[in-house]
Amino acid sequence: LQIAEGWTVELPEEVLRAKPSELSGGQRQSVCIASVLAMKPDILIMDEPVSSLDPNGKKMVQDILGELRDSGNTTVIVDNNLVWSAGIVDHVVGILDGEVVFDGSRDEFFRNFELQEKLGVILPQEVEIYRALSAKVPDVKMFYNMDQARAELAGRTTAKTRAEKEAAAESFNPVISVKDLVKQFSDGFIGLKQVNAQVPEGKIVAILGQNGSGKTTFVKHLNGLYKPTSGEVDYRGESILGKSVAQISKNIILVFQHPEHMLFEETVEKELTFCARMQGVDFTEENITEILTRYHLEKEKENFPLNLSMGQKHMLTILSVLLSSADVILLDEPTLGMDGFLIGDLEKMVLELKKAGKTIIMISHEIPFVFRLADYTVILNHGEKVFEGTKEELVEREDIFDKINIEFPPVVRLSKELGLDEIVFDVDDFIAKVTES
């Protein structure tokens, strides 16, 4: 789509011809960005512009903003996530409690570890690696992208032969089974094409794919919001197709991508107990106080939920399912709008839910977040399932990531390229392996 002279936004033909209401969240965000760029402004201000975009969409925005900078235009990005913009940002202004606490270059900011912690910004995983490594290896040079990380780390590690692990045919009890699932919408668009998948009980399962691949359509069948054109969805061996959403939600509950769709009450405290009250689940004042305190919402308990920040609203909708009876929790883009502090709280919560025997199914474009937490992955592409298995199996399938145009997390990519004897999925494990070798 040529939106102005020299500026092109790649939007698929089906997106250009569709009604905005029929697009996925990321596709709608792409269209909004394209419409603003069509005005060709001298100064462009963008507030969390890529929060709903897949890696392809983020790369598109990166490229366009790079072209704008090269042509002398100014862009101001308001965001707590520097992962996508690290390569194009020149200057950083840090604001804490309404005051400017930093005003300087990107490289200065990336060296200021204490300030990064205070602001709770989300950093590129390469910067996290540099920060952790510099504490143990004082002479390491700063890096913030993959090329720099490769160059700096290549001479510091000794490649080892990584033992090829046979894919263990781990048996599991599927809590949800999907059989030959087809979804055709009223306009003829086929959102899901003969999808077969199983969800292992008590695991963290990630649903991956580009915007428009069918991820949200898929999970909306799991809690009955969508009825399939054909196919079957079973919960513990029993079909859910004849049941209402209210009946299904006692066992399988969905937290929407956009929290405004789930906020109904006048206060944060009432919102927290909404699901439990609707399901007739008992709870105590101690339960409420403990959750609000642990997740830093105790000062907000009498406030109107819609007045919270985006990240707090999203966290509140997730917290509201903690008191429900559901043992399968579906999270659609759970990190949307969250800063580093909230994401840290979310990770702990998800791991605690798993420890309690719950099954968590997550849709997310935040690939490092997914690889830190997920045990099992299902990948969709244009409505078809192209992979199902553990993340250990997935990292051996580069062809799958090439097909869906998603990059491996930096720690996984570097584990492979540096010849570590084991592929690791988080920064702490990576640093341990690098310093060991």
Which residues does each predicted region cover?
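Conserved ABC ATPase signature
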Residues: 19-23, 27, 304-308
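Conserved ABC ATPase "signature" region
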Residues: 1-14, 283-300
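Catalytic Walker B motif of ABC-type/P-loop ATPase nucleotide-binding domains
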Residues: 44-47, 329-332
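Conserved ABC transporter NBD signature motif
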Residues: 231-239, 248
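The feature captures the beta-strand-to-loop junction immediately N-terminal to the Walker
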Residues: 208-210
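Helix-to-loop junction immediately C-terminal to a conserved catalytic motif
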Residues: 223
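Conserved ABC ATPase "signature" C-loop
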Residues: 97-98, 382-383
